[in-house]
Structure formats: structure tokens, C-alpha cells
Amino acid sequence: VEIIANDQGNR
């Protein structure tokens, strides 16, 4: 799977 960083808490 690929993990996509976003501004909703994944960073």
C-alpha cells in the first residue's frame, strides 16, 4: 500500500 501524507493528521 502507499501511505499518503495529508493535513488531516497523517503527517
Curated annotation (Swiss-Prot):
Keywords: ATP-binding, Nucleotide-binding, Stress response. It comes from Pinus pinaster (Maritime pine). Coiled coil: none annotated. Disulfide bonds: none annotated. On the 2D-gel the determined pI of this protein (spot N164) is: 5.4, its MW is: 73 kDa. One of its GO terms (molecular function) is ATP binding. The keyword Oxidoreductase does not apply. The keyword ATP-binding applies. It comes from the Eukaryota. This is Heat shock 70 kDa protein. Belongs to the heat shock protein 70 family.
